[in-house]
């Protein structure tokens, strides 16, 4: 058999009987890495730990800078990159990365799911895992090996532009959903050709901003990080997420890119993480041109290598800077061997040296937007919609509906009711991060208007009036480009009310039996670098809602309001006073309009629950439920502290009654203690008669009886929060530690069971240790995080 070898100039030949060890798929990965490292030049090592934007000079990046990875790669550039790699000396394959945040973002016709925040409304890790599996299957078919997802940031300041990318405000739920997404992406192992690398981001504390401003200083202590922000990352690190992305921000004056405590002491030390660390976009350059903590790219490159970064994203100046740093003795060439080895290990484990996984035309045709992927997308959209208010107007086809039983006429009003790309939200075809796709292909998205028209019975009439414009874009007065040459996006300017549009909307409402108003935000108002100072509806949307509320008051006809937005926005007071129903749709993805139509008509049941709280006013923040106890009073002088809608909230079309609750202890030896150990029992509103005692190695088991007292099927999400009554340090009043989703037919009674390891009932003490303190606890069981929705079961930890 003809084998490849290396010429004097390093190029592979087919003349020798021996092939290099790094090309032997039977050799251990460690041996292959060592062999290849020994063959690489200093320049090739520097390039190997660089990832550059494939929208730029791809030929120079691969042939001159020897880059190890590329991102934002168009279909045309993917094929070009494969050809260029074969022209390199060692033919080291590229890792191709892409921002597949909630679906395969930038391939025409690929599946775009609801946003992370919207999917979190399903409270269903299994569905989220399946969405990630679909994304991996589609992306891998096109030659993508890596997604920069999931996002594990905690959304606490709703002004922050990237709230939509998170799973919400609760660390426990974030860990549940992020873990599921990692499993979906990475599949059964990296040798599976449909697997792609997952990337946990943004490590860590990135969302703890100043004033909600993206990438601003995160004023956060080590103890606070350990308490709330690190646990989801620790979970996915220990479960095998192969890459981590480092946030833009500084913490305590040190950029995360250089934070040796986080990167080396915690991540690689305490957690034993062996995966690859990548900077976020131009983190190394930002130390020079934005944060001004390094004098030039030479010093910035040296600092990044010393701190333990493995791959430098989109800093072209790193190449010359790192070479200069080696030449001047700031770092040694051997300092590159660790990061280069970690990059190469992933390439070997992915099997890229044997199969570089270039675009596969047959798989692309079979997988991109496949019917089963669309069906899953619809199911996730259905499960994610959250019904927040309903006075009986919904469902529209119910005999009990407030809409007259004559011929149905529905007025669909609002600027987002028939807006395909803004329905998808950020990180999708029209969101502007890449230059080869302006919007998703027509026909792949079902808007609310389209969905209703397709789903209503024969004889119904669905009219449409836009009613308002949201914004217009104008050039940024600060200039056309940032300091690094990246173009500044245009700035948004709110549109004024248009009397003609308002009159058209009022006429449509007056002529209908019910009005559906679809309002929210647009891509220009959400995402990276797009934080907002307020949470109000932009443009003329508030004026539109005022007019529609006036009409509803005058006619008595139902007004249904749908909030389609990347983050929790504030609805005007008139909506809270007048609207018959309110639905949070988030960014519901390609099938969102159909799912919403089915919900409105009663073809499906509402099942979603809020993963995040809604403020009444931007100045009311923070509104997240798990705040530290201990303040004067429980309201502002001018406003309640109670959010408009709370974490965990969500209605069904039926009613579910909570019956008696019990708490028992399952011993740590695994034997079921039900019936064998004393347990706490409480009926609604009653105190428990016994207090179980548990050890740290035990599990508490909560059972609650649920009865569907309505005439329609119901889906109830039983939530269990832990309240540690006396703590050695200030701590949250309650934390979600478990939940169960229960389906109930009309009149059915079922028992829900939630198990919570006592070890989860922990806090972080003053020495930054996570511990379970002995003492009295309560398990708070109920429908949402509202105190009035919860019943308490006491237990003691010894």
Regions found by a protein language model. Give the residues of each.
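Intrinsically disordered, low-complexity regions enriched in glycine and serine
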Residues: 669-678
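Glycoside hydrolase catalytic-domain context in secreted enzymes
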Residues: 1-669, 684-687, 692-765, 773-787, ...
């Amino acid at each position: 058999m003809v084998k490849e070898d290396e010429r004097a100039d390093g190029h592979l030949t087919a003349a020798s009987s021996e092939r290099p060890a790094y090309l032997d798929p039977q050799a251990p990965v460690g041996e292959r890495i060592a062999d290849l490292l020994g063959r690489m030049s200093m320049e090739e090592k520097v390039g190997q730990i660089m990832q550059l934007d494939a929208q730029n000079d791809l030929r120079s990046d691969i042939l001159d800078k020897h880059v190890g990875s590329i991102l934002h790669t168009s279909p045309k550039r993917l094929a070009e990159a494969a050809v260029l790699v074969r022209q390199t000396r060692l033919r080291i394959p590229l890792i191709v990365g892409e921002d597949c945040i909630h679906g395969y973002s930038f391939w025409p016709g690929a599946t775009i799911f609801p946003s992370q925040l919207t999917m979190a409304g399903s409270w269903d890790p299994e569905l989220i895992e399946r969405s990630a599996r679909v994304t991996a299957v589609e992306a891998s078919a096109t030659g993508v090996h890596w997604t920069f997802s999931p996002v594990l940031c905690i959304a606490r300041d709703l002004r922050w532009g990237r709230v939509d990318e998170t799973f919400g405000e609760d660390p426990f739920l974030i860990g549940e959903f992020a873990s599921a997404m990692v499993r979906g992406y990475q599949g059964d192992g990296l040798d599976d050709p449909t697997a792609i690398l997952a990337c946990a981001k943004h490590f860590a504390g990135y969302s703890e901003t100043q004033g909600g401003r993206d990438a601003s200083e995160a004023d956060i202590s080590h103890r606070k990080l350990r308490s709330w922000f690190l646990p989801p990352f620790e979970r996915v690190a220990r479960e095998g997420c192969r890459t981590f992305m480092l946030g833009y921000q500084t913490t305590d004056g040190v950029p995360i890119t250089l934070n040796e405590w986080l990167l080396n002491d915690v991540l690689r030390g305490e957690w034993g993480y062996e995966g690859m660390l990548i900077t976020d976009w131009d983190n190394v350059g930002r130390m020079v041109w934005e944060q001004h903590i390094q004098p030039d790219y030479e010093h910035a490159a040296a600092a990044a290598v010393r701190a333990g970064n493995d791959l430098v994203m989109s800093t072209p100046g790193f190449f010359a800077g790192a070479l200069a740093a080696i030449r001047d003795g700031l770092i040694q060439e051997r300092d590159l061997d660790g990061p280069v080895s970690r990059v190469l290990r992933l390439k070997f484990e992915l099997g890229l040296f044997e199969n570089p996984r270039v675009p596969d035309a047959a798989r692309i045709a079979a997988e991109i937007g496949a019917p089963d992927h669309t069906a899953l997308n619809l199911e996730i959209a259905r499960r994610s919609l959250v019904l927040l208010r309903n006075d009986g107007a919904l469902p529209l086809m119910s005999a009990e509906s407030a809409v007259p039983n004559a011929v149905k006429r529905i007025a669909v009003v609002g600027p987002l009711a028939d807006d395909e790309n803004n329905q998808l939200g950020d990180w999708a075809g029209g969101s502007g991060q890449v230059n080869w796709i302006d919007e998703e292909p027509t026909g792949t998205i079902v808007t609310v208007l389209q969905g209703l028209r397709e789903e209503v019975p024969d004889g119904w009439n669905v009219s449409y009036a836009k009613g308002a414009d949201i914004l217009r874009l104008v050039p940024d007065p600060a200039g056309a480009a940032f300091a690094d040459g990246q173009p500044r996006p245009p700035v948004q300017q709110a549109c004024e009310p248009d009397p003609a549009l308002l009159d058209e909307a009022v006429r449509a409402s007056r002529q209908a039996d019910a009005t559906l108003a679809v309002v929210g935000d647009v891509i220009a108002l959400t995402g990276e670098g797009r934080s907002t100072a307020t949470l109000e509806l932009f443009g003329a949307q508030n004026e539109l809602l005022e007019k529609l509320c006036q009409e509803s008051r005058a006619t008595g006809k139902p007004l249904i309001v749908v909030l389609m937005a990347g983050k929790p926005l504030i609805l005007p007071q008139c909506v809270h006073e007048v609207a018959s129903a309110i639905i949070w749709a988030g960014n519901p993805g390609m099938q969102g309009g159909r799912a919403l139509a089915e919900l409105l008509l009663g073809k499906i049941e509402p099942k979603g629950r809020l993963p995040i709280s809604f403020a009444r006013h931007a100045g009311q923040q923070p509104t997240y439920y798990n705040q530290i106890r201990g303040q004067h009073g429980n309201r502002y002088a001018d406003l309640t502290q109670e959010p408009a809608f709370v974490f965990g909230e969500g209605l069904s079309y039926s009613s579910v009654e909570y019956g008696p609750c019990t708490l028992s202890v399952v011993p740590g030896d695994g034997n079921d203690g039900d019936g064998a150990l004393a347990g706490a029992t409480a009926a609604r509103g009653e105190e428990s008669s016994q207090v179980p005692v548990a050890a740290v190695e035990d599990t508490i088991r909560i059972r609650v009886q649920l009865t569907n007292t309505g005439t329609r099927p119901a889906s109830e999400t039983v939530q269990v929060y832990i309240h540690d009554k006396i703590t050695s340090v200030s701590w949250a009043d309650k934390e979600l530690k478990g939940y169960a989703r229960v389906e109930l037919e009309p009149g059915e009674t079922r028992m829900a069971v939630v198990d919570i390891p006592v070890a989860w009932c922990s806090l972080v003490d003053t020495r930054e240790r996570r511990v379970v303190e002995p003492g009295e606890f309560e398990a708070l069981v109920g429908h949402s995080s509202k105190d009035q929705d919860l019943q308490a079961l006491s237990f003691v930890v010894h």
